[in-house]
A protein has these predicted regions:
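Short loop/turn motifs enriched for small/polar and acidic residues
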Residues: 36, 130, 163
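Short, intrinsically disordered/low-complexity patches at protein termini
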Residues: 90, 101-102, 110-112, 161
Length: 187
C-alpha cells in the first residue's frame, strides 16, 4: 500500500500517521510518502512525458520513484487537506506529474472522455480529504475532482472519505477499515 501524504504540517498528518501505523500493525506493507519532506518540482507542461520520453518526466527530482511505487501498489491512498475544493499543493504537484502514467490518446468512458491507459493494471484509490465541513461547497468540488482523477488514472475502484481535522478514534478506525476492506465501511 502506498500513502501519498499531502499534509502541510505535522499537526495535519496525525490521522495519516495513525492510518499507516494501523495498516502496518495489521500486517500490510505500507510505504508512507510525506510529500512536504520531498523537494519535488511542479509539472512544466512540456508534455515530454508523452512525446519525447514516454512515461518519464524530464525533471529528475525523485518523482519517478513515487510514480513507480504508485503503479506497483494494490492500494494508493491520497491523503491531505481539502484546499479550496482541491488537493494540497504537495499532493497536486505529484498528481499533475502522473500525466506520464497515461497515454496522450483519448477514449470514451461512459459519458465522458478520458486518456487511454499506459499500463495494464492500476491501483485502487482511497482519497481522503481532511475537512471540518464534509458537506460544504469545497467538499462537493473536491469529490468531483477526486472522482475525475480516478477515472483518468484508470483506478479499478475509488473510495472517497472525508475526515475531520481532529478525528475521533472511531473515525480513524473506520478509515483504516476502508483501506483494508472497503465493502465493510459505509461511505
Amino acid at each position: 500500500m502506498l500513502i501519498l501524504d499531502g499534509s502541510r504540517t505535522e499537526a495535519e498528518d496525525t490521522a495519516c500517521l495513525d492510518l499507516a501505523r494501523r495498516l502496518t500493525e495489521g500486517g500490510h506493507q505500507v510505504q508512507h510518502e510525506r510529500l512536504r519532506d520531498r523537494k519535488l518540482g511542479y509539472c512544466q507542461g512540456c508534455f515530454g512525458c508523452w512525446v519525447e520520453h514516454p512515461g518519464r518526466c524530464k525533471t529528475d527530482d525523485g518523482h519517478a520513484e513515487i510514480g513507480r511505487a504508485f503503479m506497483a501498489a494494490d492500494v494508493a491512498v491520497l491523503y491531505g487537506p481539502v484546499t479550496f475544493g482541491g488537493y494540497s499543493a504537495a499532493l497536486e504537484k505529484v498528481l499533475d506529474r502522473f500525466l506520464g502514467l497515461i497515454m496522450p490518446f483519448f477514449q470514451k468512458y461512459g459519458d465522458i472522455t478520458r486518456h487511454t491507459a499506459r499500463h495494464a493494471r492500476h491501483p485502487r484509490l482511497v482519497v481522503v480529504g481532511v475537512t471540518d465541513d464534509p458537506h460544504g461547497t469545497d467538499a462537493r468540488t473536491f469529490r468531483k475532482l477526486a472522482m475525475r482523477n480516478a477515472v483518468n488514472l484508470h483506478a479499478p475502484r475509488v473510495d472517497l472519505r472525508f475526515i475531520d481535522r481532529a478525528p475521533t478514534e472511531s473515525a480513524r478506525a473506520d478509515l483504516a477499515r476502508c483501506v483494508i476492506e472497503p465493502e465493510a465501511v459505509a461511505a
